[in-house]
C-alpha cells in the first residue's frame, strides 16, 4: 500500500476510535477494556475512566504470543484471570477503532468464554 492509503486508513481508525470513546465509559466496578493491536503483539488494559487509572493490564510480549487469533485467546485467558483476581466480572469492551473481526473478535469471544461479561 502507498503512504497515502496507509495515512487514510489510520485517519479512519482514529475517527472510529473517537466516535466509540464518546459513547462508552468505564468505572471501577465495570472498567473499559481497551485493546491495542500491532503487527507483532497485542496489548490490553482495564481502565477506570472516572479516576483515569489502569486497573489491570496484559501484554502479549511478556507471554511470547503473536498478534493472531490463537494469541488473542491465550491473552484473553490470562487477562480474565487477572480481572477475576481483582473481583471484576463485568466490563465494557473498547475495540479502539478496530473492526470487530479477526483478532479483536477472537479476543472478545475468549474473554466471554473465560467468564467476563462484555
UniProtKB/Swiss-Prot annotation:
Any Gene Ontology biological process: translation
Keywords: Ribonucleoprotein, Ribosomal protein, RNA-binding, rRNA-binding
Disulfide bonds: none
Membrane-spanning intervals of the chain: none
InterPro entries (alphabetical): Ribosomal_uL18_bac-type, Ribosomal_uL18_bac/euk
Record GO cellular component, one term: cytosolic large ribosomal subunit
Annotated GO MF terms: 5S rRNA binding; structural constituent of ribosome
Family stated for the protein in its record: Belongs to the universal ribosomal protein uL18 family.
Protein function: This is one of the proteins that bind and probably mediate the attachment of the 5S RNA into the large ribosomal subunit, where it forms part of the central protuberance.
Subunit structure: Part of the 50S ribosomal subunit; part of the 5S rRNA/L5/L18/L25 subcomplex. Contacts the 5S and 23S rRNAs.
Name of this chain's protein: Large ribosomal subunit protein uL18
Source organism: Campylobacter curvus (strain 525.92)
